[in-house]
Structures are given as C-alpha cells and as structure tokens.
C-alpha cells in the first residue's frame, strides 16, 4: 500500500493549522519532524493529532537510547508511529518495539547513516520492527546522494513496509 506523508520539520508554530489544514484531504500521514519536535516539544504531536484525528501521526523521535521511554513519550503525545535510529543498539530498538506492541502502535527504524543498509534491515526485521525507513539526509543530498538508490535492494531484502524520506520530490520521482 502506498501512502502519502507530509513532514513538518521547520515551520513557525502559529502557522501549523493554516499549513496543515489544506493538506488534510490529500495526505494520509502527518509527521512531526525531528526539528519541529526539538523546537516546540511533543506538544506538536498533540496538535497534529487534533488537526488530523483520522490521520496516521508519526513522531520522528530518531531515538538513539532509552527506546521504551521515548516510545511511551511519543505515544502518550498521540503518535501512532515513532522512529528509532537503526544504528541504535538492539536493546534500544527492542524496548521501543515492546512498548509499541503493548500499545498497538508501530516503530519505524530509520536507516540514515547506516553503511550496510540491507544487512541492518534484515537484522531489524528479526528484532520485530514494523517498518524500515530509507532516509537520505539533507547533508548527503547536498553531496549528490540519490534518495532512491537503496530502495530496491532493501525492499527485496525484507518483508516489511518501507518508508522513503529525504529528497523525494517531482524530480526524483
């Protein structure tokens, strides 16, 4: 299944409703991006939940430690999905997955910065993650990285939904 997700990364907080409101009929998933959460706190997840009660809400926590704690924080704020960095230790990932499973939520493991994305995606599947994220970071994009380069290899390697982020636009599609 293909879903369209919009990430709110950098936006004045007072423009959230006027920016997201017109998008609600056109997107399936609303994401509180990492910079947005860092700027304004997890309250932005609550606001996205209020704006799009029927939408899937993602908190891009990029957890690197304390997976269970961060998962609980994201889910308490109204997220359906939270992210953990794939380079985090297995215990961190397992903690987030355990909380997500207990609460009927999901975890995406973001492969940003992982050298062997296919091998790690296979390991993550074994840890029970619900989705893997193929994410080409802004800094890598500036150096000319192709945001879709790893996609085919990863989708062929794991039987998990794959989320694609970073550098996806009309030119790259």
Regions found by a protein language model. Give the residues of each.
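Structural detector of well-ordered beta-strand residues that form the stable sheet scaffold
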Residues: 5, 31, 57-58, 108, ...
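Alpha/beta catalytic cores of nucleotide-metabolism and tRNA/nucleoside-modifying enzymes
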Residues: 156-158, 169-173
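Conserved anion-binding
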Residues: 4, 66-159
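Conserved N-terminal beta1-alpha1 strand-loop-helix module at the mouth
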Residues: 1-68, 76, 117, 124-127
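Phosphate- and divalent-cation-binding pockets in alpha/beta enzyme and binding domains
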Residues: 15, 92, 172
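Active-site beta-loop-alpha junctions enriched in small/polar residues
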Residues: 7-11, 33-37, 62-66, 87, ...
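Residue-level detection of beta-strand scaffold positions
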Residues: 24, 51, 158-160, 165
């Amino acid at each position: 299944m293909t879903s369209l997700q919009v990430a709110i990364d950098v936006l004045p907080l007072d423009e959230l409703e006027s920016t997201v409101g017109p998008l609600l009929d056109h997107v399936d998933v609303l994401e509180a991006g990492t910079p947005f959460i860092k700027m304004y706190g997890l309250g932005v997840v609550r606001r996205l939940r209020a704006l799009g009660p029927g939408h899937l809400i993602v908190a891009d926590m990029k957890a690197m430690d304390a997976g269970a704690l961060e998962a609980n924080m994201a889910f308490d704020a109204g997220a359906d999905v939270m992210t953990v960095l794939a380079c985090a230790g297995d215990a961190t990932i397992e903690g987030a997955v355990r909380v997500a499973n207990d609460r009927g939520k999901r975890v995406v493991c973001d492969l940003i910065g992982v050298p062997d994305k296919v091998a790690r995606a296979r390991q993550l599947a074994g840890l029970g993650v619900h989705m893997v994220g193929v994410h080409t970071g802004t800094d890598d994009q500036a150096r000319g990285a192709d945001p879709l380069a790893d996609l085919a290899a990863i989708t062929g390697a794991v039987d998990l939904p794959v989320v694609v982020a970073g550098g996806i636009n009309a030119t790259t599609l």
